A protein has these predicted regions:
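Long amphipathic alpha-helical segments
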Residues: 1-87
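Gly/Ser/Thr-rich loops at beta-strand to alpha-helix junctions
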Residues: 20-21, 117-126, 147-148
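Short helix-capping/linker segments at secondary-structure and domain boundaries
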Residues: 34-41, 74-78, 135-136, 268-272, ...
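Non-catalytic, soluble scaffold/interaction modules
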Residues: 48-75, 86-98, 120, 233-252, ...
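Ligand-binding beta-strand-loop-alpha-helix segment within the catalytic cores
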Residues: 71-115, 131, 135-185
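Short hydrophobic segments within beta-strands
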Residues: 118-120, 143, 220
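Histidine-anchored nucleotide/phosphate-binding helix
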Residues: 123-134, 207
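Conserved phosphate- and dinucleotide-binding cores of soluble alpha/beta proteins
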Residues: 137, 145-306
Length: 306
């Protein structure tokens, strides 16, 4: 594989704090630069790049969708032209979708007194929506987001960009306690599958508690996160290093450090994309319309080397 593209993929794979949309945009930039350096890309090059993106962040739908576009291009008679068109569409959606989601979010908050919002982890789309609606938000409460501390990043950005918003940080274990005082639990998603959405581990418990006490759960994600069943079947939820939990753990101690979990769609959960509010049934129809390359499943395995 092209070494500059390889370095870009490796940097994306190592990133533990950026949201899926941010990483996908970086991936699009790297792929478009690669395509310009190699105006005629071979089928093998496309499939090698597809494999690299499949394994870089295997729980994040936009990167899996980009891998799918690379695999689809490999079977085209004019792969370079197909790839340029698909990357242009993908990049445009990633650039413009956050503003559309932010507009819908602002309208949903209404014009009554400013609200308290609970959020979890870090999502660039959620952050942009909150900042755009700062005149209608009194306070945002978020937890640390251990072990990678993405919640701190969220709070730092709100303090820097969300003038007038009260920023409050708490522990992961205590975040649910403040849901009763909030207008809504607002989270992002790394993937939107047919039966549920994938986000940071711990999201499911927050959603269950919010639903139990009657608080709305809003999932903000653009349509690059839509994940067809055939791609979801090869997706994997990565576990982190033991050292992120305990740097010098005792021998014989097993450490479980899941990064992601799937939360099923349920009453109280509303999905907001750039197209507006979506029901699970609407999501399923849109997901089923996405073309999936038959080559994708085989690419999960490392390429054969002779």
């Amino acid at each position: 594989m092209d070494q500059r593209l390889r370095r870009a993929v490796d940097a994306i794979a190592r990133d533990r704090s950026s949201g899926a949309a941010e990483l996908a945009f970086r991936a699009c930039v790297a792929l478009r630069q690669w395509a310009r350096r190699q105006p005629t890309v071979s089928r093998d090059d496309l499939l090698a790049a597809a494999h690299a993106f499949l394994t870089a962040q295997p729980a994040m739908a936009p990167l899996l969708r980009l891998a799918n576009e690379l695999a689809l291009a490999a079977d085209e008679s004019a792969p370079s032209r197909y790839l340029e068109r698909s990357l242009s569409r993908f990049s445009y959606a990633l650039r413009t979708s956050p503003a559309g989601i932010a507009r819908h979010f602002l309208l949903a908050l209404g014009k009554a007194k400013p609200k308290i919002i609970i959020t979890y982890s870090y999502s660039s789309i959620v952050l942009r929506a909150i900042v755009a609606a700062r005149s209608r938000i009194w306070q945002v409460i978020c937890s640390e987001g251990r072990p990678a501390l993405e919640g701190r990043k969220t709070m730092q950005q709100i303090l820097r960009r969300g003038k007038g918003i009260g920023a409050c940080l708490t522990t992961d274990a205590a975040l649910h306690m403040f849901t009763a005082y909030s207008h809504a639990l607002v989270v992002g998603a790394d993937s939107l599958a047919e039966t549920g959405f994938i986000n940071k581990a711990g999201t499911g418990a927050l959603v269950a508690h919010a639903a139990q006490i009657g608080r709305p759960i809003w999932v903000l994600a653009d349509t690059s996160k839509l994940l067809p069943r055939a791609i979801d079947a090869i997706r994997s939820d990565r576990y982190g290093l033991d050292s992120e939990i305990w740097a010098a753990a005792p021998r014989r101690l097993s450490i479980l450090n899941p990064y992601f979990e799937t939360t099923r769609y349920q009453p109280g959960v509303s999905i907001l994309t750039e197209k507006g509010w979506r029901t699970p049934a609407q999501m399923r129809r849109e997901i089923k319309a996405i073309k999936v390359s038959p080559l994708l499943a085989a690419l999960v395995k490392p390429p054969h080397r002779s």
